[in-house]
Every structure is written in structure tokens, then in C-alpha cells.
């Protein structure tokens, strides 16, 4: 091997060592960050705005976040994560939580929220201004304890097509899906089926365009006839 060839070989090895060290350093920084964010030295019962303004595209913390306490607030956890597209369904489990208001507010790149437990006392503005949101795996209303718990929940959700499951009975006023002009037939039916039969004088609002695309007049009349105690408004 010539001297020139040896020099080339040394340079290649140095680059490989440098890249390996850089990767190791990045992993150390990653671990250090999450050791701070998810410190186990204290028992955490407050998650408000935990990831607000983060620039991640995929919500994937190092350790799972499991919440099973009615006093734990998760309001604004992902507030204004403008690049966030979705989250890891295996890393978030909100079995029981206090307010989840503004949970994903202003996540303007959010495309889907997988089916995760999300049982909270308040979903006000939870998905507001999520312009690109297409699908939500689960809408759990079983823990809501305020009449305004669904106010502005889907404000400006223009792209929303499907809510995979509605869990519990809706007894809140102000559920408004007027912006969701692409909402599918199955979601209409799930929501109407979930409206409480025991409460009177409340209103749920849908998009006239979405309704026209999903139902014949006869089908719509039959559906709303199942909940005569509710006003189903079309805008």
C-alpha cells in the first residue's frame, strides 16, 4: 500500500470514528433531555403545556405517559406544536384525567390522532385550529363534568372526516362540527347515537354540506327522529 493510499485509509477511519462519536453524543443528549422532561425523582401530577411549541413531527416520548388520576391536568399538552402530524399510540394512555382543554390547539399540521384512552373532565378547544386533522380514533365523553365541556372542541377542523368511536353519552351543549364539511356518514351516526336520550333543549351542529353528501333526505329524517329531544342544527 502506497503512502497516499495509507493516508486515504486513515482519513476514512477518522471520519468513521467521528460519525460514531457524533451518533453516540446525540444519543446522550437525547437521553439527557428525556431524563429532565420525564424525571422520575418526583411524582408528577401536572402535565399542562408539557410539550407546547415543540417542533417535533411525531409525538414519541422516551417513556410512556400513563395518567390515571382525576386530579391530573393535561390541558395544552401539545399546544401549538405546529409541525406535529401524529403521536405514538403506545406512548400515551390517558385512562382518567382532569381538563384536556386546548390539548392539540393550533397543531396546524396534525393529520391524525390514533385511538388512545382520553377520558377527561373537559375537552374545550381540544382540537381547535387543527386545520389538517383527518381522523380521530376516539372521542370519549364519559368523564365530562361540565355543560361546556365540548365547546369549540372541533373549531376550524376543516379536513375532519372520521371519528372512529364515540364513548359515553353526550350531555353537553355546544358540540359544533360546522367546519367539517367532509365528515363521513358513520361519524354522523356515531355522534347522534351517543346523544343522551334523557336531556332536553341542547343543540349539536353539523355542516350542511357534509350532511347533504352523506344522507338522503329520508335517511336524515330517520336519523334525527331517533333523538327528538335534541336540536340538530345544519349550517
What are these model-predicted stretches?
Residues 77-81, 102-107, 126-130, 153-157, ...:
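Periodic small-residue-enriched repeat registers in elongated scaffold domains
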Residues 18, 97, 101-102, 124, ...:
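Residue-level detection of beta-strand scaffold positions
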Residues 29-72, 82-98, 108-121, 131-148, ...:
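Structural signature of tandem-repeat unit edges
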Residues 1-30:
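Short, low-complexity N-terminal tether/leader segments at secretion or assembly junctions of large
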Residues 37, 78, 127, 154, ...:
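Hydrophobic, Leu/Ile/Phe/Ala-enriched alpha-helical segments that form helix-helix packing faces
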Residues 214-227:
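Short, aromatic/basic amphipathic alpha-helical patches
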Residues 74, 100, 123, 150, ...:
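Generic structural signal for hydrophobic residues
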Amino acid at each position: 500500500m502506497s503512502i497516499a493510499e495509507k493516508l486515504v485509509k486513515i482519513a476514512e477511519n477518522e471520519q468513521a470514528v467521528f460519525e460514531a462519536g457524533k451518533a453516540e453524543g446525540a444519543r446522550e443528549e437525547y437521553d439527557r433531555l428525556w431524563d429532565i422532561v420525564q424525571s422520575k425523582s418526583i411524582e408528577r401530577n401536572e402535565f399542562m403545556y408539557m410539550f407546547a411549541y415543540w417542533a417535533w413531527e411525531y409525538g414519541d416520548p422516551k417513556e410512556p405517559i400513563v395518567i390515571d388520576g382525576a386530579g391530573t391536568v393535561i390541558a395544552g399538552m401539545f399546544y401549538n406544536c405546529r409541525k406535529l402530524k401524529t403521536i405514538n399510540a403506545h406512548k400515551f394512555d390517558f385512562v382518567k384525567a382532569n381538563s384536556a382543554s386546548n390539548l392539540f390547539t393550533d397543531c396546524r399540521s396534525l393529520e391524525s390522532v390514533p385511538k388512545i384512552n382520553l377520558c377527561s373532565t373537559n375537552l374545550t378547544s381540544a382540537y381547535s385550529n387543527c386545520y389538517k386533522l383527518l381522523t380521530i380514533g376516539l372521542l370519549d365523553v364519559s368523564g365530562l363534568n361540565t355543560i361546556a365541556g365540548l365547546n369549540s372542541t372541533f373549531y376550524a377542523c376543516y379536513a375532519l372526516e372520521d371519528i372512529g368511536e364515540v364513548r359515553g353519552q353526550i350531555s353537553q351543549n355546544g358540540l359544533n362540527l360546522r367546519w367539517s364539511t367532509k365528515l363521513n356518514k358513520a361519524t354522523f351516526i356515531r355522534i347522534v347515537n351517543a346523544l343522551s336520550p334523557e336531556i332536553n333543549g341542547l343543540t349539536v351542529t353539523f355542516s350542511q354540506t357534509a350532511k347533504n353528501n352523506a344522507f338522503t333526505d329520508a335517511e336524515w329524517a330517520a336519523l334525527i327522529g331517533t333523538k327528538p329531544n335534541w336540536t340538530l342544527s345544519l349550517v
